[in-house]
């Protein structure tokens, strides 16, 4: 397990760099946050504004690459939770898996919306799936930071 932590971290950093590099074309004056602007585009008007300025193919490439990023951050967060080796590790590993699952849902819905299978209600679901994903991932990161300071009981030795 300890060997997986640096490997999963390297995979995470690699995917983060790839996503930033590939997503630079999505950063415009109308979308300073790149693909995050699509994730949080609650209204059809905002969605259509993004469509005007973005390359259709680059958006889809970014979303498809995000599936690898999901694997990377979920693997890293689970591995880090297990490395924390305390009584809450399994709970927070579950939160990491849930964050990844919400991200997968969000990506599938964004693909549907971006490809013209558009229902305004889908934007609301994408918005909330994205918000829940970030909340869960933030909770896990917070847990990991607190674990570094020993604020959770260690697992008893078997």
Language-model regions, residue ranges each:
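Hydrophobic alpha-helical transmembrane segments
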Residues: 58-80, 141
């Amino acid at each position: 397990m300890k060997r997986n932590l640096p490997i999963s971290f390297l995979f995470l950093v690699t995917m983060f760099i790839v996503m930033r590099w590939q997503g630079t074309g999505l950063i415009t004056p109308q979308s300073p946050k790149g693909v995050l602007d699509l994730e949080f585009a609650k209204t059809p008007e905002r969605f259509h504004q993004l469509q005007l300025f973005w390359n259709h193919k680059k958006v889809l490439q970014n979303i498809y690459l995000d599936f690898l990023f999901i694997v990377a951050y979920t693997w890293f967060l689970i591995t880090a939770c297990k490395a924390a080796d305390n009584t809450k590790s399994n709970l927070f590993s579950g939160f990491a898996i849930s964050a990844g699952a919400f991200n997968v849902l969000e990506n599938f819905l964004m693909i549907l919306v971006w490809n013209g299978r558009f229902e305004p209600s889908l934007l609301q679901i994408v918005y909330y799936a994205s918000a829940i994903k970030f909340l869960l991932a933030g909770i896990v990161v917070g847990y990991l930071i607190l674990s570094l300071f020993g604020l959770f009981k260690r697992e008893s030795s078997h």
